[in-house]
């Protein structure tokens, strides 16, 4: 991944497939815009990286439908519980499904000061619209490390290959 095209809180070691370097860089740039907008607490700028009909599922399970809903909710959050936070997003991989669709997996979290352990896993479904990559769907899941450890101890084959 090209670290120069991302903010310093988007340090990834992921891999893209299929020799799609320009598309990979464009997707990384969109996610850097997302991180930057979050850091500024700018809900309007945050919303510009989503499609008009995007869906957004928070780690709490809340489902937001459409850019306007995503912007309104983040405006409220940036003014309250998320005020002054920053967003860390470490890209794990980018996979392409045709010329205009990609799925991005990442680890991330919100933080104040310096980022700590990234406790959430995200999946972004990206689409190219009018030559620009945008987020069409976002899913955020909080990892439960204790339950993962218990599962892996009792069922070692359940551990993801990347973590073996």
Language model region names:
Residues 34, 46-47, 54, 66, ...:
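Hydrophobic pocket/interface hotspot
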Residues 63, 88-91, 119-123:
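Well-ordered beta-strand positions in beta-sheet-rich domains
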Residues 1-52, 153-164:
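Short, low-complexity N-terminal intrinsically disordered segments enriched in polar/charged residues
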Residues 60, 107-108, 139:
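A mature extracytoplasmic/lumenal domain signature
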Residues 2-9, 119-149:
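Short beta-strand edge/turn micro-motifs at domain boundaries
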Residues 64, 110-111, 141-142:
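Short, surface-exposed beta-strand-loop junctions and turns on beta-sheet-rich folds
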């Amino acid at each position: 991944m090209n670290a120069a095209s991302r903010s310093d809180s988007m340090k990834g070691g992921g891999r893209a497939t299929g020799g799609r370097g320009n598309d990979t860089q464009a997707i990384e740039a969109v996610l850097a815009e997302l991180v930057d907008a979050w850091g500024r607490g700018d809900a309007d700028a945050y919303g510009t990286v989503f499609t008009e009909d995007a869906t957004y599922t928070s780690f709490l399970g809340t489902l937001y439908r459409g850019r306007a809903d995503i912007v309104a909710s983040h405006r409220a959050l940036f003014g309250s519980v998320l005020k002054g936070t920053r967003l860390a997003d470490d890209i794990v991989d980018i996979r392409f499904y045709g010329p205009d669709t990609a799925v991005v997996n990442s680890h991330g979290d919100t933080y104040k000061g310096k980022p700590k352990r990234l406790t959430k896993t995200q999946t972004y479904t990206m689409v190219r619209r009018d030559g620009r990559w945008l987020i069409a769907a976002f899913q955020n899941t909080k990892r439960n490390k204790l339950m993962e450890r218990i599962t892996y101890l009792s069922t070692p084959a359940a551990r993801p290959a990347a973590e073996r």
